[in-house]
């Protein structure tokens, strides 16, 4: 039988690094109760994104934390707030944007750690729960509002700004 596709190379995934003990905080949270059946959780990391200097940024959903790992592998807690950040991306102008399940579309001042709401609702309607985002080459921002939707409830949305 003809197969036009080449054999896929299997690559063994290995941990890049682990969260330092000083940032681990195993306890129940209002995020973990519905999403992890009430289990204690140390962290739930999402939204990896590199800035222009090569630092790796990501979010910790249950604790509302934004972290940066420097090019030297040093962890830094940039900010912590009362939200559930899920996705993080950098615009080509250097600004950081966050999709937050509870708070909507946010911006982050990477120097001060200040969080600002860009869009908390749309068309006078609350979001279901923002999840992730992507910047197109022309600068348009696409973001998903999925909440707890899925096959049984296919009402999630994609927005463009």
Regions found by a protein language model. Name each.
Residues 1-161:
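Sequence-structural signature of mature extracellular/luminal beta-sheet repeat domains
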């Amino acid at each position: 039988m003809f197969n036009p596709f080449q054999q896929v190379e299997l690559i063994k995934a290995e941990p890049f690094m682990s969260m330092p003990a000083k940032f681990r905080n195993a306890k129940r949270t209002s995020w973990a109760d519905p999403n992890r059946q009430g289990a204690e959780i140390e962290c739930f990391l999402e939204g990896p994104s590199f800035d222009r200097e090569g630092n790796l940024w990501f979010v910790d959903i249950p604790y509302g934390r934004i972290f940066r790992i420097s090019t030297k592998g040093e962890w830094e807690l940039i900010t912590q707030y009362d939200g559930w950040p899920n996705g993080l991306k950098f615009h080509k102008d250097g600004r950081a944007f966050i999709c937050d399940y509870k708070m909507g579309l946010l911006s982050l001042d990477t120097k001060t750690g200040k969080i600002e709401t860009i869009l908390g609702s749309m068309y006078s309607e609350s979001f279901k729960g923002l999840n992730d985002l992507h910047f197109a080459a022309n600068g348009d921002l696409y973001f998903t509002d999925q909440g707890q939707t899925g096959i049984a409830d296919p009402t999630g949305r994609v927005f463009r700004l």
